[in-house]
Amino acid sequence: MKRSFTTLTDATLITAVVQSGCGEVITDALLEIGIQGSTIHAAMGVGIRERLGALGVAIDAEREVVSVMVSSDEVDRIFERIFLAAKLDVPGMGFMYATPLLQAATYVPPSILSKYAGQ
């Protein structure tokens, strides 16, 4: 049996690096607008903390990285939603970026494939 797969070519990965505990705030904000497929993982930040020596102990290096793949036509709306939910307009809260994806692959149900066949 030949295996086949469907690739998505009009997708963007939005990534937010935020303070520990903020990942759930972001996923809740995404769920409110129907986005269910985000991923959170823990990270450790390095940089200014090390340069401050003993004073660096006061800086929390724990971070969370939230990633979500979205359709390219939804990027602006979802990017803004994450930015506001994570309060990234406050210094020290984190940063985010969007990466265009050349290809992404996952299981797509036949009912969805037939809906978009020929487009």
Question: Where does each model-flagged region fall?
Answer:
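Positively charged, small/polar-rich N-terminal and surface patches that mediate targeting and assembly
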Residues: 1-119
